[in-house]
Regions:
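C-terminal beta-signal and adjacent terminal beta-strands/loops
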Residues: 119, 124, 156, 196-203, ...
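Membrane-embedded beta-barrel scaffold of Gram-negative outer-membrane proteins
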Residues: 53, 59-61, 88-140, 147-149, ...
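Outer-membrane beta-barrel "beta-signal"
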Residues: 51, 95-99, 147, 251-264
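Short, small-residue-biased leader/transition segments that mark boundaries at the very start
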Residues: 3-8
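Gram-negative outer-membrane beta-barrel transporters
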Residues: 21-25, 110-117, 133-202, 227-230, ...
Length: 264
């Protein structure tokens, strides 16, 4: 006869953070969080950074932070793909970013360089049909963004990211490029964008590695009926691309839907 045992685990956490303007061009951010788990133990999670306020609304930031997360009850015990042997994930993140504005604030731009070193990142492996720890990860890359407000009706935005992975991460792309535009006119609003994804890892299982590349076009239109309601129609993957984010699970082709939003 099988006997059931009740597993009781306690957890508490606390944090403190502060921001101090050292002078007109330099600010300091610092903080620390303590996370105690009766099964895993106590973990200190610090972060800190400097922000340099430059002329013409430009800003340079440097930051170092630690990330830490215990597996949840759902990930460990509830429904497939549960795994009771999951370990806590942790990582160190180093970032250097620069942001600025031009044309009287009509144009904004930014670039971000980062390096991540982590261990035991929790992910779902479709081939094994369960949650697993990925082992060690070491990633670095760059992210850029650009926004331009043409006039009170039109706005354009674009972003690009490049990611180098020493150890491939499931569902992470090497290149991602997006360009879109937004239009508003009285009660109407319209937004559309095209996204190009290259080198997305759909499977990282040894011997079954697989990558995908695809282009997505999405569109959304809204009409405000009154102060608390609007109707919308949106289309996703309008180019009807065949692609997967996780191997063995194809994403829908062209999808169109509409509805009413009511806000109270």
């Amino acid at each position: 006869r099988r006997q059931r045992q009740m597993c009781i685990r306690d957890r508490f956490a606390g944090y403190v953070d502060f921001r101090q303007d050292i002078n007109s061009w330099l600010s300091l951010d610092a903080g620390v969080r303590i996370d105690h788990h009766s099964h895993v133990g106590t973990e200190w999670i610090p972060q800190g950074g400097l922000a340099f306020h430059l002329p013409r609304q430009a800003e340079l930031k440097a930051m170092v932070s630690k990330g830490f997360r215990n597996p949840t009850i759902r990930e460990m015990y509830m429904f497939p793909p549960q795994n009771p042997d999951l370990k806590a994930e942790s990582l160190m993140n180093y970032e250097l970013s620069f942001t600025g504005q031009l044309l009287g604030g009509a144009m904004s731009y930014g670039v971000n360089l980062y390096y991540i070193n982590g261990d035991n990142i929790i992910m779902t492996d479709p081939a094994l049909r369960k949650n697993v720890n990925s082992g060690e990860i070491e990633n670095w890359g760059v992210e850029t963004n650009l926004g331009y407000r043409i006039n009170r009706h039109w706005q354009m935005n674009a972003n690009y990211s490049w990611l180098h992975m020493e150890n491939p991460v499931l569902a992470a792309p090497e290149h991602k490029l997006y360009a879109g535009t937004d239009f508003t006119q009285r009660r109407w609003s319209l937004s559309t964008g095209i996204q190009y994804v290259k080198g997305l890892h759909t499977s990282v299982t040894p011997g079954k590695e697989k990558q995908e590349s695809f282009v997505l076009w999405n569109l959304r239109a809204n009409y405000r009926l009154c102060s608390f309601a609007d109707v919308f129609v949106k289309g996703e993957n309008l180019l009807a691309q065949r692609y997967e984010i996780n191997a063995g699970f194809p994403m829908p082709k062209a999808t169109v839907m509409g509805g009413v939003n009511i806000n109270f």
